[in-house]
Amino acid sequence: MMTRRDAITKTVLTSLFAFGAPGLALRSHAQSSSAGPYTLPPLPYPVDALEPYIDAQTMQIHHDKHHANYVTNLNRVLAKSPDISSKPVEELVMNLKEVPDNLRSNVKSNAGGHVNHTLFWSMMKKNGGGQPSGELGKAIDKKFGTYAIFKDMFSTAATRVFGSGWAWLVLDGQELKIESTPNQDSPLMAGKMPLLGIDVWEHAYYLKYQNRRADYVEAFYNVINWDFAADRYKKHMKA
Protein backbone atom coordinates (compact mmCIF):
# COMPACT_ATOMS: atom_id res chain seq x y z
CA MET A 1 0.00 0.00 0.00
CA MET A 2 1.39 3.41 -0.98
CA THR A 3 2.16 5.62 2.00
CA ARG A 4 1.41 9.34 2.12
CA ARG A 5 5.14 10.07 1.76
CA ASP A 6 5.38 7.76 -1.26
CA ALA A 7 2.40 9.49 -2.84
CA ILE A 8 4.00 12.90 -2.38
CA THR A 9 7.28 11.73 -3.91
CA LYS A 10 5.46 10.24 -6.90
CA THR A 11 3.44 13.41 -7.47
CA VAL A 12 6.52 15.64 -7.25
CA LEU A 13 8.43 13.66 -9.84
CA THR A 14 5.64 13.00 -12.33
CA SER A 15 4.36 16.57 -12.34
CA LEU A 16 7.83 18.02 -12.85
CA PHE A 17 8.53 15.76 -15.80
CA ALA A 18 5.13 16.46 -17.33
CA PHE A 19 5.64 20.23 -17.20
CA GLY A 20 9.20 20.46 -18.41
CA ALA A 21 11.28 20.68 -15.24
CA PRO A 22 13.40 17.52 -15.46
CA GLY A 23 16.36 18.82 -13.49
CA LEU A 24 15.00 17.90 -10.09
CA ALA A 25 16.43 14.64 -8.81
CA LEU A 26 18.26 13.81 -12.04
CA ARG A 27 21.94 12.96 -12.20
CA SER A 28 24.52 14.36 -14.54
CA HIS A 29 27.02 11.72 -15.64
CA ALA A 30 29.31 14.51 -16.80
CA GLN A 31 29.82 15.74 -13.25
CA SER A 32 32.65 14.49 -11.08
CA SER A 33 31.69 12.49 -8.02
CA SER A 34 33.11 15.24 -5.79
CA ALA A 35 30.64 17.72 -7.25
CA GLY A 36 27.63 15.65 -6.33
CA PRO A 37 24.71 14.44 -8.45
CA TYR A 38 22.48 17.51 -8.59
CA THR A 39 22.22 19.87 -11.54
CA LEU A 40 20.59 23.22 -12.19
CA PRO A 41 17.48 22.64 -14.33
CA PRO A 42 16.94 25.06 -17.20
CA LEU A 43 14.08 27.50 -17.03
CA PRO A 44 11.03 26.00 -18.78
CA TYR A 45 10.58 29.23 -20.78
CA PRO A 46 12.72 32.14 -22.08
CA VAL A 47 14.15 34.43 -19.43
CA ASP A 48 11.90 37.30 -20.55
CA ALA A 49 8.73 35.19 -20.81
CA LEU A 50 7.17 36.61 -17.64
CA GLU A 51 7.58 40.27 -18.61
CA PRO A 52 6.25 42.75 -17.65
CA TYR A 53 5.29 41.16 -14.34
CA ILE A 54 8.67 39.63 -13.52
CA ASP A 55 11.53 41.20 -15.42
CA ALA A 56 14.17 39.32 -17.38
CA GLN A 57 17.09 40.59 -15.31
CA THR A 58 15.50 39.37 -12.09
CA MET A 59 14.76 35.98 -13.64
CA GLN A 60 18.30 35.60 -14.93
CA ILE A 61 19.95 36.50 -11.64
CA HIS A 62 17.43 34.50 -9.63
CA HIS A 63 17.95 31.35 -11.70
CA ASP A 64 21.58 31.59 -12.82
CA LYS A 65 22.98 32.92 -9.54
CA HIS A 66 20.71 32.23 -6.57
CA HIS A 67 19.29 28.86 -7.59
CA ALA A 68 22.66 27.80 -8.98
CA ASN A 69 24.31 28.59 -5.65
CA TYR A 70 21.94 26.26 -3.82
CA VAL A 71 22.82 23.45 -6.20
CA THR A 72 26.57 24.11 -5.94
CA ASN A 73 26.48 24.31 -2.15
CA LEU A 74 24.34 21.19 -1.86
CA ASN A 75 26.79 19.21 -3.98
CA ARG A 76 29.70 20.50 -1.91
CA VAL A 77 28.06 19.49 1.36
CA LEU A 78 27.02 16.05 0.14
CA ALA A 79 30.44 15.28 -1.30
CA LYS A 80 31.26 14.42 2.32
CA SER A 81 28.51 11.79 2.42
CA PRO A 82 28.22 9.84 -0.88
CA ASP A 83 25.53 7.51 0.47
CA ILE A 84 23.19 10.45 1.01
CA SER A 85 24.02 12.10 -2.31
CA SER A 86 22.68 9.02 -4.09
CA LYS A 87 19.13 10.04 -3.14
CA PRO A 88 16.78 12.30 -5.13
CA VAL A 89 16.76 15.74 -3.60
CA GLU A 90 13.07 15.63 -2.70
CA GLU A 91 13.79 12.53 -0.62
CA LEU A 92 16.45 14.47 1.25
CA VAL A 93 14.06 17.24 2.26
CA MET A 94 11.37 14.73 3.22
CA ASN A 95 13.77 12.69 5.35
CA LEU A 96 16.07 15.20 7.01
CA LYS A 97 16.28 13.10 10.16
CA GLU A 98 18.33 10.60 8.17
CA VAL A 99 20.95 13.23 7.34
CA PRO A 100 23.93 13.29 9.76
CA ASP A 101 23.71 15.98 12.41
CA ASN A 102 26.79 17.81 11.18
CA LEU A 103 25.33 18.14 7.67
CA ARG A 104 21.63 18.57 8.37
CA SER A 105 21.44 22.35 8.61
CA ASN A 106 23.31 22.91 5.34
CA VAL A 107 21.37 20.18 3.56
CA LYS A 108 18.08 21.63 4.79
CA SER A 109 18.90 25.11 3.48
CA ASN A 110 20.42 24.13 0.15
CA ALA A 111 18.27 21.13 -0.74
CA GLY A 112 15.24 23.17 0.28
CA GLY A 113 16.39 26.02 -1.95
CA HIS A 114 16.90 23.63 -4.86
CA VAL A 115 13.50 21.96 -4.46
CA ASN A 116 11.62 25.21 -3.90
CA HIS A 117 13.10 26.98 -6.90
CA THR A 118 12.71 24.03 -9.25
CA LEU A 119 9.02 23.98 -8.37
CA PHE A 120 8.74 27.77 -8.52
CA TRP A 121 9.83 28.00 -12.16
CA SER A 122 7.15 25.51 -13.19
CA MET A 123 4.51 27.21 -11.06
CA MET A 124 4.70 30.16 -13.48
CA LYS A 125 4.28 30.49 -17.24
CA LYS A 126 3.92 33.03 -20.02
CA ASN A 127 0.31 34.15 -20.45
CA GLY A 128 -0.57 32.54 -17.16
CA GLY A 129 -2.91 33.76 -14.49
CA GLY A 130 -6.67 33.64 -14.52
CA GLN A 131 -8.46 31.36 -12.11
CA PRO A 132 -8.08 27.64 -11.49
CA SER A 133 -10.75 25.45 -13.03
CA GLY A 134 -11.65 21.78 -12.86
CA GLU A 135 -11.12 19.78 -9.70
CA LEU A 136 -8.68 22.23 -8.13
CA GLY A 137 -10.95 25.20 -8.81
CA LYS A 138 -13.85 23.42 -7.16
CA ALA A 139 -11.68 22.41 -4.20
CA ILE A 140 -10.51 26.00 -3.70
CA ASP A 141 -14.10 27.27 -3.76
CA LYS A 142 -15.17 24.56 -1.31
CA LYS A 143 -12.32 25.24 1.11
CA PHE A 144 -12.08 29.03 0.98
CA GLY A 145 -15.52 30.08 -0.28
CA THR A 146 -14.48 31.87 -3.47
CA TYR A 147 -11.35 32.42 -5.51
CA ALA A 148 -11.33 36.05 -4.36
CA ILE A 149 -11.18 34.96 -0.73
CA PHE A 150 -8.40 32.49 -1.54
CA LYS A 151 -6.44 35.22 -3.32
CA ASP A 152 -6.79 37.60 -0.38
CA MET A 153 -5.64 34.93 2.08
CA PHE A 154 -2.71 33.86 -0.10
CA SER A 155 -1.61 37.48 -0.59
CA THR A 156 -1.81 38.10 3.14
CA ALA A 157 0.35 35.06 3.84
CA ALA A 158 2.93 36.24 1.30
CA THR A 159 3.10 39.86 2.40
CA ARG A 160 3.29 38.99 6.10
CA VAL A 161 6.31 36.69 5.83
CA PHE A 162 8.88 38.29 8.11
CA GLY A 163 12.19 38.61 6.32
CA SER A 164 12.81 35.88 3.76
CA GLY A 165 10.57 32.94 2.96
CA TRP A 166 7.71 31.58 0.90
CA ALA A 167 3.91 31.43 0.86
CA TRP A 168 2.23 28.24 -0.29
CA LEU A 169 -1.00 26.55 -1.25
CA VAL A 170 -0.51 22.99 -0.05
CA LEU A 171 -2.29 19.71 0.35
CA ASP A 172 -2.05 18.41 3.90
CA GLY A 173 -3.35 14.92 3.36
CA GLN A 174 -6.38 15.79 1.24
CA GLU A 175 -7.02 19.20 2.80
CA LEU A 176 -6.05 22.44 1.08
CA LYS A 177 -4.20 24.92 3.28
CA ILE A 178 -2.42 28.25 2.89
CA GLU A 179 0.77 28.58 4.88
CA SER A 180 4.17 30.21 4.87
CA THR A 181 7.65 28.87 5.49
CA PRO A 182 10.79 30.74 6.56
CA ASN A 183 13.99 30.86 4.56
CA GLN A 184 14.16 27.84 2.21
CA ASP A 185 12.02 25.49 4.26
CA SER A 186 9.78 23.38 2.04
CA PRO A 187 6.30 22.05 2.82
CA LEU A 188 7.71 18.67 1.81
CA MET A 189 9.73 18.73 5.04
CA ALA A 190 6.43 18.52 6.94
CA GLY A 191 4.92 15.88 4.65
CA LYS A 192 2.75 18.35 2.74
CA MET A 193 2.36 18.66 -1.03
CA PRO A 194 3.07 22.14 -2.45
CA LEU A 195 0.68 23.05 -5.27
CA LEU A 196 1.52 26.74 -5.61
CA GLY A 197 4.23 28.85 -4.05
CA ILE A 198 5.66 32.34 -4.24
CA ASP A 199 9.21 33.27 -3.33
CA VAL A 200 9.21 36.43 -1.21
CA TRP A 201 12.94 36.67 -0.67
CA GLU A 202 13.97 40.17 -1.77
CA HIS A 203 16.09 38.78 -4.61
CA ALA A 204 12.85 37.57 -6.23
CA TYR A 205 11.47 41.06 -6.74
CA TYR A 206 13.70 43.90 -5.52
CA LEU A 207 15.16 44.98 -8.87
CA LYS A 208 11.69 45.78 -10.23
CA TYR A 209 9.55 46.38 -7.16
CA GLN A 210 12.10 47.55 -4.55
CA ASN A 211 10.37 47.37 -1.16
CA ARG A 212 6.88 47.02 -2.66
CA ARG A 213 6.39 43.35 -1.93
CA ALA A 214 2.61 43.66 -2.16
CA ASP A 215 2.92 44.90 -5.76
CA TYR A 216 5.09 41.91 -6.64
CA VAL A 217 2.61 39.52 -5.03
CA GLU A 218 -0.25 41.09 -7.00
CA ALA A 219 1.75 40.82 -10.24
CA PHE A 220 2.42 37.13 -9.53
CA TYR A 221 -1.24 36.29 -10.18
CA ASN A 222 -0.70 37.18 -13.85
CA VAL A 223 1.90 34.45 -14.34
CA ILE A 224 0.55 31.57 -12.24
CA ASN A 225 0.60 28.23 -14.04
CA TRP A 226 -2.69 26.85 -12.79
CA ASP A 227 -2.36 23.85 -15.12
CA PHE A 228 0.72 22.76 -13.18
CA ALA A 229 -1.02 23.18 -9.83
CA ALA A 230 -4.14 21.38 -11.05
CA ASP A 231 -2.11 18.47 -12.38
CA ARG A 232 -0.32 18.05 -9.05
CA TYR A 233 -3.63 18.23 -7.19
CA LYS A 234 -5.27 15.63 -9.41
CA LYS A 235 -2.37 13.19 -9.25
CA HIS A 236 -1.95 13.50 -5.50
CA MET A 237 -5.66 13.01 -4.80
CA LYS A 238 -5.62 9.84 -6.89
CA ALA A 239 -2.41 8.45 -5.38
Task: Indicate residue ranges for each PLM-predicted region.
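N-terminal secretory signal peptides and thylakoid transit peptides that target proteins
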Residues: 1-16
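All-alpha RGS (Regulator of G-protein Signaling) helical domain and cognate RGS-like helical scaffolds
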Residues: 33-37, 65, 71, 76-86, ...
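Acidic/His metal-coordination segments adjacent to aromatic residues that form catalytic metal sites
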Residues: 49-53, 95-102, 182-185
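N-terminal targeting pre-sequences for secretion and organelle import
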Residues: 215-239
